[in-house]
Amino acid sequence: MLYSLVHKISVLAIKLFFNQISLQNKQIVPNQGPVIFVANHPNFFMDPLIAGSYCPRNLYFFAKSTLFNSSIRKWILTRLNLVPVYRKIDDEDNMGKNKDSFKKGYEILENNGAFLIFPEGVSIGKRVLEKLKTGAARIGLEAESKNDFDLNIFVIPIGLSYSDQIRFRSNVMIRFGNPIKIKDFEKDYKLNKVDAVKKVTSIIRKSLNELTNYYQTDQIEDIVQGLELIYKMELMTELGMEVDNKNDDFITSKILTDAVQWYEKNEPYHITNFRRKLSEYVALLKKLDIRDEFLDPARQEKRNWGKTRTILFLIIGSPLFLWGIITNYIPYILPRIIVKTSNKDQSEEASWKLIYGFIFFAIYYIASTTLVWGLTQNLLVTILFSVSLIPSGDFALYYSKNIKKYKQHVKFLSIFYKKRSLLFEIIQKRMELLQYIEESKNRYLDTLEGKDTNYG
């Protein structure tokens, strides 16, 4: 009962928080039978909500034991299908209690149930997969061993990728990976239990890396982000991909990441050279306070039409924008203020924004609708008012983004007339970067000849 209610609320909250939710390979998930879902963990609270809401199975969740630190919390979380996991970093003395947690995992699988576990064990908020704990592999193998390897347990990896981990109305992609059949490791387990657990964990890690836009190390983060900034759209066009397609966007980021990782391993001096050129270019962008897209000739035609369309949109849409601000600004800004002043970790920001936002918007919408009813005593007016709240809020956000784009355009024109020499300098830097990228790309592609690289 409580699980079902929270599940419905979670789906609604997630749809309101994110602009676009892309779900891939959901058909892979079996409708019945024992399944262990494993996912990466960039966002401590949002990840289980998203995975649990869009997984086609009722789930149990293995969560850190510190969440169960009061009798009330324990009562609630237990009824939400949460199972405590005792971590060494929290309290080494309680590690022995994990026997009960593992036992619960066996029971779930033996009853053809499914549970979700985050094998990283921590949520850092970076695009780097942390060292995986072996719990998922151990539970799966030991459950099969206790039942003569007849349970037919599958481990299904889930890749969670956020376009922006902390921004409201950003995008998220959920990718289900190929099932890992635990029975396939029966011989390995009987030969050497520890090695079998490590083998399954290694396969899980490989799968999660394939399903996410993660780096092997955060030392190349600035390089990949720089390429995504100035070259991703051009590469997508060159590859015949759709710029607005989230899967194509993901694949392109993966291609760029793989290329950078190859260079870091084989020709690191090119990484150093590119980092220097990139930092000089980004410094000029910041100095002029403009975005890279305004320097991209490929977007010029689209931008010219976009300028006219934006002006018309800003004029025609201004009344609805004002209505959206009046009816949504207070519950929109309060969560941001609270999260900012409380200095939350980046991996927690979006989660707390979602929690506070859901509370404030619910209270504000109910209170304002009640007020309108009290003032008008008109059912039709009250219904129209309440129905307008969410769409007008979404429109206000979209409108404000267009205002920012237009301000950038005006600033670009101002720079063109007042700081032309500096603008030409930054354009020259950009051209040098693109030439360096093209040369590096061709050199990298030469190394891939004869190799079968699959990003789908």
Task: Mark where each language-model region is.
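A short, well-structured juxtamembrane/interface segment
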Residues: A13-G33, S440-N454
